[in-house]
Amino acid sequence: MGVTKKPDLNDPVLRAKLAKGMGHNYYGEPAWPNDLLYIFPVVILGTIACNVGLAVLEPSMIGEPADPFATPLEILPEWYFFPVFQILRTVPNKLLGVLLMVSVPAGLLTVPFLENVNKFQNPFRRPVATTVFLIGTAVALWLGIGATLPIDKSLTLGLF
């Protein structure tokens, strides 16, 4: 933590700068009413007008039309849901899968209390938090990669 030096108001150079208005926030243009009352509404209304104009002028559909009677064989979620999908896919009891998903944020909330005595920001001086981060990242990557594979190879990633 750095030590901030208090300004010496008896210094003639500083007094001259302050007399000219330097060192204060009196430069530029005030945010009220110029920005907040005039510029921001113009930008917001212009953005809305552009979106409405594009929707009216080009009402094309995005992607293929949905067919509820023809579903794909393997439905995969978005990539950021792969670890959660893998947990739900491999655990036989769905209640246990939901409890495992709830335990992840609950476990992350306990990490600051495990090392609350340690005030360092260097990760090498906080071994518990660093270990939890590295193991959690490895498990999330393992589960995420496994979710893209068939169920028989998903836990071992086809390595074993």
UniProtKB/Swiss-Prot annotation:
Superkingdom classification of source: Eukaryota
GO terms under biological process: photosynthetic electron transport chain
Q: Which PROSITE patterns match?
A: CYTB_CTER
- GO cellular component entries: chloroplast thylakoid membrane
- Classification via Gene3D superfamilies: plastocyanin oxidoreductase, Single helix bin
Query: GO MF terms on file?
Result: electron transporter, transferring electrons within cytochrome b6/f complex of photosystem II activity; electron transporter, transferring electrons within the cyclic electron transport pathway of photosynthesis activity; oxidoreductase activity
What transmembrane ranges does the database entry give? 36-56, 95-115, 131-151
Q: Where in the cell is it found?
A: Plastid, Chloroplast thylakoid membrane
The membrane-topology field of this record reads: Multi-pass membrane protein
Q: What broad class describes the main subcellular location of this protein? A: plastid
The text of the family note is: Belongs to the cytochrome b family. PetD subfamily.
Q: What else is known?
A: A longer mRNA that is not produced by splicing has been shown to be transcribed in barley and maize; it can also be predicted for this organism. It is not known if this mRNA is translated.
Q: How does it assemble?
A: The 4 large subunits of the cytochrome b6-f complex are cytochrome b6, subunit IV (17 kDa polypeptide, petD), cytochrome f and the Rieske protein, while the 4 small subunits are petG, petL, petM and petN. The complex functions as a dimer.
HAMAP family xref list: Cytb6_f_subIV
Q: State the function annotated in the UniProt record.
A: Component of the cytochrome b6-f complex, which mediates electron transfer between photosystem II (PSII) and photosystem I (PSI), cyclic electron flow around PSI, and state transitions.
- Kindly give the PANTHER family that the UniProt entry links to this protein: CYTOCHROME B (PTHR19271:SF16)
Record-given protein name: Cytochrome b6-f complex subunit 4
